Amino acid sequence: MKNKFLICDECQAVNIKTLKRKLEKLDPEAEIEIGCQSYCGPGRRKTFAFVNNRPLAALTEDELLEKVTAQLKKPRDPEEEERLRKRNEERKRRKEEQDRKLKEKLAKRKAIK
């Protein structure tokens, strides 16, 4: 089973250029998905990545890579990964819904003015 890394291109603590290169070096065969992961709270203070749908965070990229390496060595449970994937998708869906409602609310306020 191919490893999958999810990294955010919007969070302040994530340097996408260096992190992507380091993850590619760690596992050249892994799938890397870049985009908002709806993990904004921790993403303001820590660099993070989702590894096989499991969130990992650290204060530095080097610390994060140590955690990623340890996670990759652990045996994978397909059922657990599927549960985590669904949870991550639901979290993203809720964030998109909140963003949509906020945009609608702001548009209504502009229309009133």
Curated annotation (Swiss-Prot):
Record-linked Pfam families: DUF1450
TM ranges are none
List the coiled-coil residues: 78-113
- In residue numbers, the region (Disordered) covers 69-113
Judging by the UniProt lineage, the source's domain of life is Bacteria
InterPro entries associated with the record: DUF1450, UPF0741
Which portions of the chain have biased composition (kind: Basic and acidic residues)? 74-105
Q: Determine if Transport is one of this entry's keywords.
A: no
Key words of the record: Coiled coil
- What is stated as this protein's family in its record? Belongs to the UPF0741 family.
Provide the protein name. UPF0741 protein SH2399
Q: Which organism is it from?
A: Staphylococcus haemolyticus (strain JCSC1435)
